Design a protein with these regions (language model features):
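The conserved cystathionine-beta-synthase
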Residues: 17-37, 42-43, 86-106, 111-113, ...
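Short glycine-rich, polar/acidic loop-and-turn segments at beta strand-coil junctions
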Residues: 22, 43-45, 57, 61
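Short, solvent-exposed loop/turn segments that connect beta-strands within catalytic domains
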Residues: 45-51
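Short hydrophobic/glycine-rich mini-motifs in sensory/regulatory modules
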Residues: 51, 115-117, 246
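Conserved active-site beta-strand-loop modules that form the wall/rim of enzyme catalytic pockets
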Residues: 168-170, 182-183
Length: 267
């Protein structure tokens, strides 16, 4: 099935387009408000190189900076955190989009059509289980990933380093069936209240503890639940994941693991 037929909704969204000189504090506010994986940086359809900022690129750049310079980071132009976007034509097969995710290890891409374009992400694709466009004869336990956890008094800086090292977007709280995400961390540290504190003491930007953040309780499914059931309404949740006894289940697990195993059926 073609991308255009599988996920036509991607061209109906409205994205703010950042100028390369947009300050990081403004860019991050827009990223928080729109609750999406990335924002494009001033480009036009047809250009050979597409740039964007993502939560991952912003946080990884922040960790490279000394705490005393966190204030300077907020004033930097957003282009300093830019990453090159992978692009694909809307006329390509759905599997080609998934293979692009597999290659880049990022769960989003820029999809182009004549005169229009938009982001496609794994979050868009999990609903395809419900309408039968994709399917896999696997259960939740077959695709679950290990649960990594940290104490709730862990500061945000070390927590982010832990998440980046393991290439995970969620970390659970030790002793609790709750977790935080990279998106949740962005929403917290770049909120108005935290930025007011950081304006006076920039070095404290990442001093908050995980327990200070909004902790999320994942929906539980049985180990033997079908992937269709595990995927149910996952795209409606910004912090989408499920948990079973075998581990945590994310959109990547739901789609990419069956693909990698050669067990994902696509219409």
């Amino acid at each position: 099935m073609k991308i255009s037929k599988a996920i036509p909704s991607i061209f109906k969204r409205v994205y703010p387009v950042l100028e390369p000189s947009t300050q990081m504090v403004v860019a991050l506010s827009l990223l928080r408000f729109h609750e999406i994986d990335a924002l494009p940086i001033g480009f036009r359809t047809g250009e050979s190189k597409k740039l964007a900022i993502s939560g991952y690129s912003c946080l990884s750049r922040l960790l490279e900076i000394k705490p005393k310079d966190y204030g300077r980071f907020l004033e930097m132009p957003c282009e300093v955190t830019a990453v090159e976007l992978s692009t694909i034509d809307v006329g390509k097969e759905l599997e080609a989009l998934l293979r692009l995710f597999e290659k880049t290890k990022f769960g989003f891409s820029w999809v182009e059509s004549n005169g229009s374009a938009g982001f496609a992400s794994l979050r868009d694709l999990v609903d395809l289980y419900a309408n039968g466009i994709v399917g896999a004869k696997l259960s939740a336990k077959d695709v679950a990933s290990p649960v990594y956890s940290l104490p709730k008094n862990t500061k945000i800086g070390p927590a982010l380093k832990h998440m980046f090292k393991r290439r995970i977007r969620r970390t659970f709280i030790t002793g609790e069936e709750k977790f935080v995400t990279d998106r949740g961390i962005i929403s917290y540290i770049f909120s108005a209240s935290r930025l007011n504190v950081a304006a006076k003491k920039p070095h404290t930007l990442l001093d908050a503890k995980l327990g200070d953040l909004n902790l999320i309780k994942p929906i539980q499914v049985g180990d033997d639940a079908s992937l269709k059931d595990a995927a149910g309404a996952m795209s409606d949740s910004v912090e989408n994941c499920r948990i079973c006894k075998a581990g945590v289940i994310t959109p990547w697990d739901i789609l990419m693991k069956p693909l990698e195993q050669g067990k994902l059926a696509i219409k």
